Amino acid sequence: MQRLEGGEFLMGNEGDYGFPADGEGPVHAVVLTPFYLDATCVTNEQFNAFVNATGYKTEAERFGWSFVFVGHLSPSAARERARSRVVGSEWWCRIDGATWRHPEGPGSNIKKRWGHPVVQVSWSDAMAYAAWAGKRLPTEAEWEFAARGGLVQKRFPWGDDLEPEGRHRMNVWQGVFPNVNTEADGHYGPAPVKSYRANGYGLYNMTGNVWEWCWDWFDPGWYRTSPRDDPTGPDRGERRVMRGGSYLCHASYCNRYRTDARSSNTPDSATTNLGFRCVRDV
């Protein structure tokens, strides 16, 4: 874990590149106390240790199905895609048997992906792991402070240039979403957790690769009333915050692979592009 000293920073953005409906602004000052944050997302290997120690069953395992990106379906799951596509988001399919052990559905596995971020985990699953590990999920403010890596009001953990010196610095969709991915950044799906260079705080893949669960309930109007010191989000809600974007993000569809971008999902949801990392209090 990396120790972050906290302090005051400017959270949010008011630029024309964001999504007003997500409530990315207004920019406001936040003050955080010090905390420790995992340098990487929780890996398949780490989650496997948790499951072996506790016998925990994820929500996807209990439900018997989960969501898989259409381009990643295992051969057996691909046969079901016509009847399982999500209306309005046809690149997602509801697949029976898709779990953290079989992320793309029956026939897929994680045997060569122990160092990849665990996916197909819900907010509740992430909370269970964090409690077992003696940690917790980061607040949205802690996450953004960490992602910025000490930079002030920059779009990415390294600055404002998406590809500085022509080099890819994160795992996002390259090509024409959702049908053509050139893999110019070296990856088609999730990348190992220490891919690309760490940010100024020694944290890896804070943007791109997989979305990351945060503690907070999601409210697009929250920044207008959020307290200055150690905010923890609204008291109630229907969806939990997720941050960072994923390998499925593209400028034409989901320009949320930024330090200030916000999104959300229901706490029982699990997908092939959603993971988490943990915080420990100082």
Question: What is each PLM-predicted segment?
Answer:
Residues 4, 8-10, 14-16, 20, ...:
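Functional-site microenvironments in short loops/helix caps that host divalent-cation chemistry
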Residues 27-35:
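A short N-terminal beta-strand-loop micro-motif at the entrance of redox/enzyme domains
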Residues 38:
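An anion-binding catalytic pocket shared by soluble metabolic enzymes
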Residues 43:
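Acidic-aromatic/histidine active-site loop/patch
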Residues 53-54:
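Non-catalytic, well-ordered alpha-helical segments in soluble enzyme domains
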Residues 272-282:
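Short, structured beta-strand segments at or near domain termini in extracellular proteins/domains
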